[in-house]
Amino acid sequence: PRREILYNSAKGGYLLDDTLSRFLTSSEILAVCKILLESRSMVKEEMFPILDKLILACTPLDRLNQVKDLISNERFHYVEPQHGRKFIESLWEIGTAIENHNVMEITYCRTHDGETRVRTIEPVGILFSEYYFYLAAFIEGIDKDKHFRNPQDNSPTIYRIDRIQNYKTLERHFAQRYTDRFQEGEMRKRIQFMYG
């Protein structure tokens, strides 16, 4: 951690200032930029401003230019996801619905047949795997025996966020007991890769 000892005249003594340790180091910024570029998760219009903001946080100035140089080739050859959709704001809005336990209505385009479905859902988590962000949610009012291969499975349904064509956060809330809450970390342990 980067810390400095500074004299504080108001307190009449020296204090340990750890303000600098709260910021990312240049090497940490480089690592995060590399991870983002490798993820290929966003269109350039959303990815590049995030990279630029991270790089601008580098100090001193020569480090800023060094990080720019170190990622310049990957940035130039960056391959956007095939879906070509912007969704960063959607991630935030869905995350807010999850946090507030708001019911949502989504229009979703299925991967395997392109069919569109409207679902009323209880969103419980956002995951990332293999180039895509996913929404984990429980479907309200669905006949599990009719629509699910394993009706006894209590796991949420997984939706690729870029395939959600429209969504609306409803004023209605759903109850979730602490013991039944969805845990992204546990899901990650059980499912290595989710394919869209």
Enumerate the language-model features and the residues they cover.
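Short, solvent-exposed polar/charged micro-motifs at secondary-structure junctions
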Residues: 15-19, 76-78, 114-118
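Bulky hydrophobic/aromatic content
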Residues: 24-109
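Short helix-to-loop capping/linker segments positioned immediately adjacent to catalytic or ligand/cofactor-binding
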Residues: 40-43, 112-116, 190-196
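Residue-level signal for tight coil/turn positions that link beta-strands
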Residues: 9-11, 130, 161, 171
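Short, basic/aromatic recognition patches that contact phosphate-bearing ligands
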Residues: 1-31
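Loop-centered beta-sheet repeat module
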Residues: 96-145, 155-157
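Surface-exposed, charged, gly/pro-rich loop-and-adjacent secondary-structure segments at domain edges
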Residues: 136-196
